[in-house]
Amino acid sequence: MKRLFAILIILVATAQITLASVRVEYVVPQPTSVQSGNGEFVISGKSCLVYSGAVRDAALYMLEYLPFKQILSSSKVMPGDVQLTINRFMAEEQYRLEVTKDNICITGGSYAGVFNGVQTLMQLMPVEVYKKSAKFPISVPCCVIEDSPKFGYRGFMLDVARTWIDASRVKRYIDLMAHLKLNKLHFHLTDDEGWRIEIKSHPELATIGGFRGGDSPVFPRYAKFDERWGGYYTQEELKDIVAYAAQRNIEVIPEIDMPGHSKALGAICRDILCNYTPNTSATNGLDIRNVWCAAKSSNYALIEDIIREMSQIFTSDYIHIGGDEVDMSQWKKCPDCQRLMAEHNLENEKQIEDYFIARVTEILARYGKQPAVWNEAIEGGLLPKTTRVHGWESTKKCLASTAKDYPTIVMPGEFFYFDMKQSASEPGHNWAAIFDSRKVLSFDFAKAGFTAEHMKSVAGIEASFFSEIFIAHNPETNEYLDYMLFPRLCALSEVAWSRNKRSWEQFSAAMNKAHFSRMDAMGVTYRLEPPKVTYASGVLAASVSDGSILYYTDERTGKSVKYNKPITTTEPHNYSFESRRGTGKSKTTGSTEYFATLKPAVTVTTSIPCSSRTPITNAAKYGNSIVRTTRAAKSGDWIEYRFEKPLKCREIYAQTGHIHLRRCHFLAGYVEVSYDGENFTRVAELTDGGAAVVSDKAIYALRIVATSRSDAENQVVIQSLKIK
């Protein structure tokens, strides 16, 4: 009996080890070459982590995830050990991971290559590794993986200027990048909405410019309009972020966006702006200029102070200096900038930007740095070919940059701007495209028009997240940002790393069978594909294809329960569905009837003058047509919707501002309705510029009334009503 019990213990232990291993075909991103072997290697409590060469930091990194009792600097390896070593004859980020029954050996061309191998090894282990709670023994399948990246620049741009994200959370996203072998963090530190970097010679830039709203001279935008909100990174915090990223093979490339996108700086350093008095009649007296004057020598002295201190913080050879979306009308109105044009024989204001960036480039060179810019900045034709260009506007702009032999980071918004909606009914922008991870994975250089000659100037690929909308989605938590990034960032890693392009089916299999579970362990609130919902013959049915669990909600009660079988109903519009799995979830969706809206004939009028390009009649067209006024709102302004026939409906949602963004809207106000066409009753208060109205009576007219000025824009956006 004792012998039988001992055998059972051995069998159970073996079963546990077998369950721990992960199939090599589910590594994300897909390696270049994989040879599966027979058997497995077991890391035990007696295994030693042995390293040779300058990879001690990689060994220490592994200790954060794996409970090795001993790490050792040695070229000698004993059976049962895990070895990290460098082979200088390999390419810098190349690695070889060999797992035999006796040992694991990761060999890289440099620290970067070894670290890449570590990430692959971790993906062959149980997901508990990512919880930092794994215990030995751990089994790893025998294999030989030889791998190297397609591009040396595999980046992600994080905008912390528009929505503040503290240092600990930035480190979290650095960790998530590292797990996907992404190696460049483009750190968008300044914009119209905030200045996030401490400059000790000019402390007010951060201590004042890092906050908006309340008593700050930086006017609030996008949300949190009634409080002083924000933050900034001290230089010590930034140095810590840089070091933390470096251990994870990630280079931090800071961005100071100029000469445009500088409204926050202009609000606290008025002298950087052009030498004229702006007309503020359309903005309730607010000066909303956001462009550095290119003619003031004092501006270049300030820029030098900033760059001097940045060069002591950031180890990257590059500092991104912006160059996008510059409102050059401010230079046209500035006598000093016009005089500059004449003195330097500049043909147009675009060449003023060239002049400005050339001056900043000279400053960068004095501190051993090179410039990176957005693609608009090269349109003047005068920037040196060493300038690195980030092509964001379109693939055509990326092609144009590479055709001019600029080293180009390919990041067209329609594929790689992860602040875009993932479907029509989800949050996010839609100006570039509406897309999910399938489209990200589909990016193909050849199909986009890149020839072999173009590819010589492609330095890499980058995704970005601009954070205007994040501030309206509980920005103190990671849920919204996670949902927007994952699994799109996983798909980006495939495009940036893998030479052997995965099909959508192969990618989905890797996610469903392995990587979603890894992200569960990482605590990532990732997006799942939404359920497919159908309604026919009184039966409402839903299904998923990724193994997630379906739930439905009865909108009348708000109760959410697990979906087990089709629902018989004559009111499909009352039911919504979502899928859940681990820490992931899908968007809320429903049948066609759930999304159906009414579009009754309506006449719209307003007390605010409207642009002839977007007349008030647009608000009666429904859909995505909008109206732009020619000034901001004042207290007492109104927008009225008068129906051709009295309207009976379930709900009316009245919204000012952009459809997807809390901007250009009434900061405070209310909605009133008329049940007789003459007298109005106040029925709802505005929240973020909008309000829902529910009535059991027929409504003749609805009016949105402002009780304060609108936000810090020179217009109000008027939408059509959303009626159910």
Identify the role of each PLM range.
Residues 20-152, 371-378, 474, 517-524:
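Acidic, contiguous N-terminal accessory segments
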Residues 510-627:
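Low-complexity, disordered linker/stalk regions enriched in Pro/Thr/Ser/Gly
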Residues 591-649, 655-665, 669, 685-686, ...:
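Disordered, acidic Ser/Thr/Pro-rich linker "stalks" and the adjacent N-terminal cap
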Residues 90-301, 305-318, 359, 363, ...:
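Feature activates predominantly on carbohydrate-active enzymes
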Residues 270, 283, 287-386, 392-395, ...:
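Active-site neighborhood of glycoside hydrolase catalytic domains
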Residues 1-24:
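Bacterial Sec-dependent N-terminal signal peptides
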Residues 371-376, 383-387, 393-545:
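Flexible, acidic glycine-rich loops studded with aromatic residues
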Residues 661-724:
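Trp- and acidic/polar-enriched beta-sheet ligand-binding modules for extracellular glycan
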